[in-house]
Amino acid sequence: MAARNAFYAQSGGVTAVINASACGVLETARQYPDRIGTVYAGRNGIVGALTEDLIDTGQESAEAIAALRHTPSGAFGSCRYKLKGLEENRAQYERLIEVFRAHDIGYFFYNGGGDSADTCLKVSQLSEKLGYPLQAVHIPKTVDNDLPITDCCPGFGSVAKYIAVSVREASFDVRSMAATSTCIFVLEVMGRHAGWIAAAGGLASDERHELALVILFPEQVFDPERFLRAVDEKVRSHGYCSVVVSEGIRGADGRFVAESGSRDVFGHARLGGVAPVIADLIKERLGYKYHWAVADYLQRAARHIASRTDVEQAYAVGKAGVEMALKGLSAVMPAIVRTSDSPYRWEITAASLAEVANVEKKMPLEFISADGFGITEACRRYLRPLIEGEDYPPYAGGLPDYVTLCNVAVPKKLAASFSV
């Protein structure tokens, strides 16, 4: 059987370790030249497939591919472009198959979150209907940690580490200034519906470093009065308070506290900044001087402080995705299965995309403390291993030495263009 080519694309918000997954895919594919020819990457994600804007990863040296493991963000470009329903816009999916057929692509690796899992499943279903042989594998990635079945999502562990470290360091800072200056620090973190990232801030405080923290989770209805009492108690007992707030907290009316009224391309409510809203509330009602910050891109781009566990898992799911495809599996996702908390042990298994697509994993309520503003010991047991270990990139001139690929374009074979 002749070798067939593969297509790899990155989707949605990038992470500190998504390129490690790309590295896992590419290095593993290169080990099977008799089965996989060239791995093409989509320039700017799935949009690259629709527009036949493909990148020939075969033009990259082994050293450059290896360097992806320690390089953040998306080396081939990503996108926030959601393919519509299969019946609603069949033309988009047929276009993908058309491009795949033109370039003899028999393997489809889509590296992203929940929406990407849905797209991968639909492409698999359509290829089967059209009689086009294709192994479609979803490579998990999301800092939100909200994909089902898998113990955790590659990308989350490094964000969790960044937030835990940042909250600890900022809390030390505000604690030292509180007597005569700022006594409130508010940090806004990502997490539209799931409070995993906010929970990671709770790791900043432990038996060795007791810090005055209040965490606002999207799983809990935001009650301004209860929140203000909690903050006031912390300031009175510790002299200061650090607040970690998820961007997705909602009020009793069900609306996002930070909702701006518009929606993004996925139809999700576009959120403004919740940190200044919370900080202003504290100032107005309690009179405390504050500083606020939004972790934003910093939390997901911080490869210099990535979790070694996260890097290893990101690479592993990329590698496993190729191995699953070569075994003939399709419409699956490499899922991480935890076999032990301490020491932390895990393995990879194949999860059906039918059970992954359009399912959002919330943080268990038993991970939130009884007062609603902290994390429990069960949550700590879950989170701690995910931020363990350091995996520093090489440095040059005092800065991380990341790789920029050549990203050589593949000549187009189709006469028809496709607009997105």
Swiss-Prot record:
Q: Which UniProt keywords apply?
A: Cytoplasm, Glycolysis, Kinase, Magnesium, Metal-binding, Transferase
Which biological process, per GO, is one annotated for this protein? fructose 6-phosphate metabolic process
The record ties this protein, via InterPro entries, to: ATP_PFK (IPR022953), PFKA (IPR050929), Phosphofructokinase_dom (IPR000023), PKF_sf (IPR035966), PPi-PFK (IPR011404)
The organism's place on the tree of life at top rank: Bacteria
Q: Indicate the annotated site residue(s) for Important for catalytic activity.
A: 141
Recount how this protein's activity depends on pH.
Optimum pH is 7.0.
Q: Name one GO cellular component term.
A: cytoplasm
Temperature profile: Optimum temperature is 30 degrees Celsius.
Where are the catalytic residues? 144
> What is a GO molecular function of this protein?
diphosphate-fructose-6-phosphate 1-phosphotransferase activity
Q: Where in the cell is it found?
A: Cytoplasm
EC number(s) on record? 2.7.1.90
Question: Which catalytic reaction applies to this protein?
Answer: beta-D-fructose 6-phosphate + diphosphate = beta-D-fructose 1,6-bisphosphate + phosphate + H(+)
Subunit note? Homodimer.
Concerning PANTHER family, the annotation shows: ATP-DEPENDENT 6-PHOSPHOFRUCTOKINASE 1
| NCBIfam families in alphabetical order | PRK14072.1
- Which HAMAP family does the entry link to? Phosphofructokinase_II_B2
Q: Which family does it belong to?
A: Belongs to the phosphofructokinase type A (PFKA) family. PPi-dependent PFK group II subfamily. Clade 'B2' sub-subfamily.
Record's function text: Catalyzes the phosphorylation of D-fructose 6-phosphate, the first committing step of glycolysis. Uses inorganic phosphate (PPi) as phosphoryl donor instead of ATP like common ATP-dependent phosphofructokinases (ATP-PFKs), which renders the reaction reversible, and can thus function both in glycolysis and gluconeogenesis. Consistently, PPi-PFK can replace the enzymes of both the forward (ATP-PFK) and reverse (fructose-bisphosphatase (FBPase)) reactions.
- Protein name stated in the entry: Pyrophosphate--fructose 6-phosphate 1-phosphotransferase
Q: What organism does the UniProt record list as the source?
A: Methylococcus capsulatus (strain ATCC 33009 / NCIMB 11132 / Bath)
